[in-house]
Amino acid sequence: YFIALGDSLDIDVDDLLDFLARDSKTSAILLYLEHLSDARRFVSAARSASRNKPILVIKSGRSPAAQKLLHVNSGMDPAWDAAIQRAGLLRVQDTHELFSAVETLSHMRPLRGEKLMIVSNGAAPAALALDELWLRNGKLATLSEETRDALRQALPVGVEIANPLDLRDDASSEHYQRAVNVLLNSQDYDALLVIHSPSAAAPGTESALALIDALKHHPRGKYVTVLTNWCGEFSSQEARRLFSDAGLPTYRTPEGTITAFMHMVEYRRNQKQLRETPVLPDSLTANTSEAHALLQQAIDDGATTLDTHEVSPVLRAYGIHTLPTWIAADSAEAVHIAEQIGYPVALKLRSPDIPHKSEVQGVMLYLR
């Protein structure tokens, strides 16, 4: 389906999630969000739907200019990230990443861990993959001595046994097959990335066939998460077609492959958060009757929002400490209060007509 909700006057995103979660023809849900009318309902619907199928989110309005255009609150992006993670969703940054991520999550089995093993026929593409993995806070696997010994016996003298495993630029398809067969016997990693750079000594199509054959005939071949990156836009077209036909995910660049792997990692982390019960503090004390009385008084007075000094008593009723707040009618009174309590102080504009004071320079910090 392709569904546009317009201004969401009658049907909102949470209604849509409830429907798509139960729809047997829907395997994944892709969301574009600007704002929410009911955050609580959205999180509830998202948590329920994400237990059954992957949900990917693009949230616009990250820049001040976009926030102004969309009339959305500034400074809310960290809250969006926290809600998306807690609901078991995956947030992506652009449409290219959106479709790449849904392709990865829809066709690959979930990861059982986050450790990555890299095999390459050159240091350069492996280094690019490592840089991207480091930037995204990914984890490299550590090879056991048993696996290292098996690789030394299987590979030519001179190949450094490490992660990444650089088979060198003269690696043949047989070297790829030997290395992968040894690694398939190992439990040291959670995902295997195989990289190939085109060279005269190492034809890409033959190496691709060797990898497919190794996975096909090994008992663990269909249970291991394998990602492939055969570099070369035209020279590796046939290899990428073979991988697609074999059901193996394949990517054009080392960075793109790492991005796909980290999508799986982040999705795994968020799904883990989805299943966790929030930890409650041992010494939680709440005077709910006092809080209810304060809120009821505000409702009786016709208030629809609470000022900073009005929120503080409600928070204190739940044991949440806040900084003391004073109200000044003019600048002279503000100076007098500041001299009484001591500098530095923060000054905030008080106006019911301006919901976001910082947007009009209505918040000044560290005044002396």
Predicted regions: what is each one?
Residues 1-368:
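Catalytic-core regions of core metabolic enzymes
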